[in-house]
């Protein structure tokens, strides 16, 4: 007899009358007056638990089975049969039930069988994957990550691992976590009285990365098409539903590509992964549509069918100025569009995903290619109905003299970026890329409102538990 995941039993991949073993945790136990107990056993392989039907003739029925409570771990062996009851097609007629682990005090078990607030679940993040919600989020997160890897592999991209420790500030915003082994009680000082980072582990001031982009560009200028996918860090003191101090970013980079090329790539990628999650995680998506956001499934279906709208930033500002809507944040040329502006464009004006292109240079990063007008850069944001910006990207500045001028304007020391500038000195090429915040993508797919609930252990200001 074989050990099988619960998903194989429920989805008909195990023949009826087969003897199987499933291993998992008790969701609920129900006892009938006829001396039969019904255990709902889950193992995380799918959304639903499998029902194990246990007769009181089992030797350990009174001693073990009747003591089982939510959270106990069990190994159930029995025959797969068609279920006469509603709610499941198959169940297991148990011939053996082993208890692998008890819940010490069922009355104080934090995940007892009742609904908990999302805020409470954050306080017990080590146990919250046992809930329907966080378990479903975890499976969707996995499926989206696998679909992204699959998409880029099929498109001929190479996955590049970029460093988490860096001396470069990709965004130029300075909101970075410092990495140091210096003794905080006895910091070395230089002649100016400043901290002497020459004495530090790396011999210079070092940080956790805010982006793998700059390193990714070096490989794109050798392998043509690459992507990075990993954790990034922002020391931004923001307590909002959209911000994390540690989050995952996907960043493709393509040599010989312009802004339109990567806008097309972004559209194809999003539609590919949305289709994958609807097909591969239908059970979890059904749960999200029923319990979290009634539009969870239909929103993705509409997205897949939609043609992306495209609009210049300047035209987008004109649309917003003339729409008759009073926004909380004022609209004028040169302002960075806020979430309410983005959502108006996607949800009300275009009623479709929108690519906004050619932003003012003063609100964008130093590496974005300066347009011929000298005022805007070849940058883009993909705006999705229901969330606003989901992707940000640009054509990169491949001209060394223009790049140096932009660095000077932004107060950056070009010598700190000597290796990045070398790409423009040795066989420079036009190249482009974008960044996708993975947690924001998961929030969009699931309808979960706060990104703290779509990453296993959220890191936010004054919170690094677990």
From Swiss-Prot:
Where does the record say this protein resides? Cytoplasm
What is this enzyme's EC? 6.1.1.22
Q: Which domain of life is it from?
A: Bacteria
Q: Where is the signal peptide?
A: none
State the protein's name.
Asparagine--tRNA ligase
Question: Catalyses which reaction?
Answer: tRNA(Asn) + L-asparagine + ATP = L-asparaginyl-tRNA(Asn) + AMP + diphosphate + H(+)
The record lists the organism as: Escherichia coli (strain K12)
- Pfam families from the UniProt entry: tRNA-synt_2, tRNA_anti-codon
Keywords on this record?
Aminoacyl-tRNA synthetase, ATP-binding, Cytoplasm, Ligase, Nucleotide-binding, Protein biosynthesis
Q: What's the impact of mutating residue 231 to L?
A: In temperature-sensitive mutant HO202
Q: Which InterPro entries match?
A: Aa-tRNA-synt_II, aa-tRNA-synth_II, aa-tRNA-synth_II/BPL/LPL, Asn-tRNA-ligase, Asp/Asn-tRNA-synth_IIb, NA-bd_OB-fold, NA-bd_OB_tRNA
Q: Which GO terms describe its cellular component?
A: cytoplasm
Q: Does the keyword Ligase apply?
A: yes
Indicate the enzyme's highest-level EC class: ligase
Report the main location listed first in the record: cytoplasm
Q: Which PANTHER family does the record cross-reference, listed alphabetically?
A: ASPARAGINE--TRNA LIGASE, MITOCHONDRIAL-RELATED (PTHR22594:SF34), ASPARTYL/LYSYL-TRNA SYNTHETASE (PTHR22594)
At the highest ranks, the source species' classification is: Bacteria, Pseudomonadati, Pseudomonadota, Gammaproteobacteria, Enterobacterales
| Family the UniProt entry places it in | Belongs to the class-II aminoacyl-tRNA synthetase family.
Gene Ontology molecular function, alphabetical: asparagine-tRNA ligase activity; ATP binding; nucleic acid binding; protein homodimerization activity
An example of a Gene Ontology BP annotation on this entry?
Answer: asparaginyl-tRNA aminoacylation
Gene3D superfamilies found in the cross-reference section: Bira Bifunctional Protein, Domain 2, Nucleic acid-binding proteins
Q: Which HAMAP family match?
A: Asn_tRNA_synth
């Amino acid at each position: 007899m074989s050990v099988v995941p619960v998903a194989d039993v429920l989805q008909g991949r195990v023949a009826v009358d087969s003897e199987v073993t499933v291993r998992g945790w008790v969701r609920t136990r129900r006892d009938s007056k006829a001396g039969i107990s019904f255990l709902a056993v889950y193992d995380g392989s799918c959304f639903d638990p499998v029902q194990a039907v246990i007769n009181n003739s089992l030797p350990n029925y009174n001693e073990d089975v009747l003591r089982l409570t939510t959270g106990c771990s069990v190994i159930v062996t029995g025959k797969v049969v068609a279920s006469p009851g509603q709610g499941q097609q198959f169940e297991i007629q148990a011939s053996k039930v082993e208890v692998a682990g008890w819940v010490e005090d069922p009355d104080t078990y934090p995940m007892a069988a009742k609904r908990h607030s999302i805020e409470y679940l954050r306080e017990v993040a080590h146990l919250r994957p046992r809930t329907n919600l966080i378990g479903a989020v975890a499976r969707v997160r996995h499926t989206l990550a696998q679909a992204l890897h699959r998409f880029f592999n099929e498109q001929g991209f190479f996955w590049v691992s970029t460093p988490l420790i860096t001396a470069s500030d990709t965004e130029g915003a300075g909101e970075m976590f410092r990495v140091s082994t210096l003794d905080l009680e006895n910091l070395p000082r230089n002649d100016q009285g400043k901290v002497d980072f020459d004495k530090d582990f790396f011999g210079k001031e070092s940080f956790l990365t805010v982006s793998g982009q700059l390193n990714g560009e070096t490989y794109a200028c050798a392998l043509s098409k690459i992507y990075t996918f990993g954790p990034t860090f922002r020391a931004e003191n923001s307590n909002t539903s959209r911000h994390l101090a540690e989050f995952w970013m996907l960043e493709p980079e393509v040599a010989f590509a312009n802004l339109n090329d990567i806008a097309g790539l972004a559209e194809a990628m999003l539609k590919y992964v949305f289709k994958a999650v609807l097909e591969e995680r239908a059970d979890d998506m059904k749960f999200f549509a029923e319990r979290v956001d009634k539009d969870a499934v239909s929103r993705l279906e509409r997205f897949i069918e939609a043609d992306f709208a495209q609009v210049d930033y300047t035209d987008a500002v004109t649309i917003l100025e003339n729409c008759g809507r009073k926004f909380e944040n004022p609209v004028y040329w040169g302002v960075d569009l806020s979430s309410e502006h983005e959502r108006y464009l996607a949800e009300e004006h275009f009623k479709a995903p929108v690519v906004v292109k050619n932003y003012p240079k003063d609100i964008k990063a130093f590496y974005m290619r300066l347009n011929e007008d000298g005022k805007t850069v070849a940058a883009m944001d993909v705006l999705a109905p229901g969330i606003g910006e989901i992707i940000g990207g640009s054509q990169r500045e491949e001209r060394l003299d223009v790049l140096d001028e932009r660095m000077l304007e932004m107060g950056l020391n070009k010598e700190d970026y000597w290796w990045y500038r070398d790409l423009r000195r040795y066989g420079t090429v036009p190249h482009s890329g974008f960044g996708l915040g993975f947690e924001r993508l998961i929030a969009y797919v699931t309808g979960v409102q706060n990104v703290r609930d779509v990453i296993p252990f959220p890191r936010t200001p004054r919170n690094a538990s677990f």
